[in-house]
């Protein structure tokens, strides 16, 4: 094992990326700052080579739009991406996990999935616009989870998934694997 270089350590703590090992960290809620940092790190790693990338996740969820940006970046990466979830893969974090080529969970990690929550105010017409947008996002969420679940459980229905998403559904690492939402427990 080579000795850590000071600039590699600084980059790791400042930006959540360790270039020599092609590892990214996702350890805060999904917001604009985390998303921008993650997207830059992934872009740098993708630009340097197509070698595999590992993402270390401990994510409680957050903003859907920033999460979808991360999801799309991982899904379209030219590199094989493995996400290792430690602690949390909750809400938007569980959705992001589905973008990876390989989805791993630590034995004590917890996954939680649900439809997102929004607050809207204003004239009825404006609230309807937000409701329609939330329904669109819910369909995108279903399309991320459902194929993964069906691969593991061919008889699982979209209605069953929708019932799970109507409330907070917590899964252990082993339950996540059994549901098809993770590939294996570390």
Segments from the language model and where they lie:
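N-terminal organellar transit peptides
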Residues: 1-186
């Amino acid at each position: 094992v080579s000795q850590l270089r000071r600039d590699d350590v600084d980059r790791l703590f400042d930006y959540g990326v360790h270039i020599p090992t092609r590892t990214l960290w996702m350890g805060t809620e999904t917001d604009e700052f985390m998303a921008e940092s993650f997207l830059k790190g992934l872009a740098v790693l993708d630009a340097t080579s197509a070698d595999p990338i590992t993402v270390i996740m401990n994510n409680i969820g957050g903003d859907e739009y920033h999460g979808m940006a991360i999801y799309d970046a991982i899904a379209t990466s030219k590199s094989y991406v493995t996400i290792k979830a430690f602690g949390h893969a909750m809400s938007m974090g569980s959705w992001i996990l589905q973008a990876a080529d390989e989805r791993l969970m630590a034995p004590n990690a917890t996954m939680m999935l649900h439809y997102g929550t929004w607050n809207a105010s204003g004239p009825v017409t404006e609230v309807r616009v937000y409701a329609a947008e939330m329904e669109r996002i819910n369909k995108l969420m279903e399309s991320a989870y459902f194929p993964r679940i069906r691969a593991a459980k061919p008889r699982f229905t979209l209605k069953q998934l929708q019932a799970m998403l109507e409330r907070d559904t917590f899964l252990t690492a082993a339950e996540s694997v059994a549901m098809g939402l993770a590939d294996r427990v570390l």
